[in-house]
Regions:
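Phosphate/pyrophosphate-binding betaalpha-module
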Residues: 124-131
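N-terminal leader/linker segments that precede catalytic domains of diphosphate-processing enzymes
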Residues: 1-59, 64-119, 127, 136, ...
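Short acidic, Gly/Pro-enriched loop/turn segments at secondary-structure junctions
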Residues: 139-149
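Sequence-specific DNA-binding recognition helix
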Residues: 132, 138
Length: 186
């Protein structure tokens, strides 16, 4: 496998330019690789279970682009430092990928980078732990394709007794999108 294979553009059907339902939130993530004797490993983090937003989720380091961030890349590097204590000099940026507009209103700016080693990682309160998966494993395994529904549901204070509200149980999903699921046991 060569670097071109790793950095190949996403197929067109995986990109979305659909209109979003919420205010746009610009975010940036780092897709970190670690080079080792066996090839390249992809580094993931597991978010702390104490977080209010997506606790326990598996993710890449990243987050909202702050006003102090000069560029989306600066945000991705800052977030990686905040979450994993990896200093900027231990991050070698390889490429930027096309921004991805999500149905939830996040514009994601991804950057592929090599980080020096797992020994440099010191998880902060935002991250429970990290793990790596050999890139070769992804090349050898097909993901499951699962549907997610984005729907509008009334909150606890929504007045369902007024005539125009109708039966909230009859409200339908507004958008279906697909997610790829890999089940790695390593």
């Amino acid at each position: 496998m060569n670097e071109q294979t790793v950095l190949a553009p996403w197929p067109e059907h995986e990109r979305t330019t659909s209109s979003v339902l919420f205010n746009n939130v610009p975010c940036a993530v780092l897709v970190p690789f670690i080079k080792n004797a066996g090839g390249l490993d992809l580094l993931f983090e597991v978010r702390s279970k104490t977080l209010r937003w997506q606790p326990g989720d598996i993710s890449f380091p990243g987050g909202k682009i702050e006003a102090s961030d000069v560029t989306p890349l600066a945000a991705a590097i800052r977030e990686t430092g905040e979450e994993l204590n990896i200093p900027p000099e231990k991050i070698r940026v390889l490429a930027s990928l096309a921004p991805l507009e999500t149905v939830t209103g996040v514009t994601l700016n991804p950057f592929v980078a090599e980080v020096s080693s797992v020994e440099d990682i010191r998880c902060t309160a935002e991250v429970d732990h990290t793990f790596t998966v050999p890139l070769q494993w992804f090349m050898e395994h097909e993901p499951e394709l699962a549907e997610m529904d984005l729907a509008t549901r009334p909150g606890a204070t929504f007045p369902v007794d007024i005539p125009y509200a109708g039966n909230p149980m009859e409200w339908r999903r507004r958008k279906t999108y697909f997610v790829y699921i890999y089940r790695y046991e390593g």
